[in-house]
């Protein structure tokens, strides 16, 4: 298969490449104009494409699935990171599995309490590409509190017991690369074991519209392991349906009853999406989502 760079070289004047992403079922999708192909490569695991769109800025895709765009990545990364970070009383040690673009790490490091944040990414080429081409999200890679580990996250987390305050799963789609390893009950159990007693957990769990099967499966498996499991939602404009799901879980901390909005109000770092009102509202689920999860 030819790379985007190779295809770009064959363009005639005033011609443009267009990026097509098909959602589950291949009947609906997203398309974006490519102003410029920045990088196109193939690792042992997946295809990596980075290109520029006139409205969205730099776009990062894995195996033909959009991971981030410069314009809207803050929505996803803030919701994935800050919900668990603000719920833990004093998060010092954090493990991020996946998230090789660096956006979740960037958000975690905004919390001054953090002493160490480990980013475990399975694909070293993603880290290299992010460091070079995704400056907006990879800005935390050289923070002295950050450690980058190239390893299979499902295997890496099993090395730890009672170790982390927060674990965040920033996985690729379960159908892309090795993302499916991060959706098993065995993996969630390993995360539970690696957390301290007051530890908290969050994971991206796909969209509840086109990917309802994976969404329900993730929720069911997480809830089998953690006594407290709650789904929350956020907007994500370039992800399927524009509605994205995350799942919070813990051994005892409740995401609403134990939430202190004053901590968020006093936070002195810039947040573009997450705030104390969004935190509470994100746990209010539409009826169709409740029904799919067996909550009504």
From Swiss-Prot:
Changing residue 173 to A: Reduces enzyme activity about 500-fold. The keyword Cell cycle does not apply. One of its GO terms (molecular function) is spermidine synthase activity. It holds the Pfam family Spermine_synt_N. Optimum temperature is 90 degrees Celsius. GO terms for cellular component: cytosol. Residues 16-251 form the PABS domain. GO terms for biological process: spermidine biosynthetic process. The active site is at 170 (proton acceptor). S-methyl-5'-thioadenosine binds at residues 46, 121, 152-153. Its EC number is 2.5.1.16. It catalyses: S-adenosyl 3-(methylsulfanyl)propylamine + putrescine = S-methyl-5'-thioadenosine + spermidine + H(+). Pathway: Amine and polyamine biosynthesis; spermidine biosynthesis; spermidine from putrescine: step 1/1. PANTHER family: SPERMIDINE SYNTHASE, SPERMIDINE/SPERMINE SYNTHASE. Homotetramer. Catalyzes the irreversible transfer of a propylamine group from the amino donor S-adenosylmethioninamine (decarboxy-AdoMet) to putrescine (1,4-diaminobutane) to yield spermidine. It has lower affinity and lower activity towards 1,3-diaminopropane, cadaverine (1,5-diaminopentane), agmatine, norspermidine and spermidine (in vitro). Belongs to the spermidine/spermine synthase family. This is Polyamine aminopropyltransferase. It comes from Thermotoga maritima (strain ATCC 43589 / DSM 3109 / JCM 10099 / NBRC 100826 / MSB8).
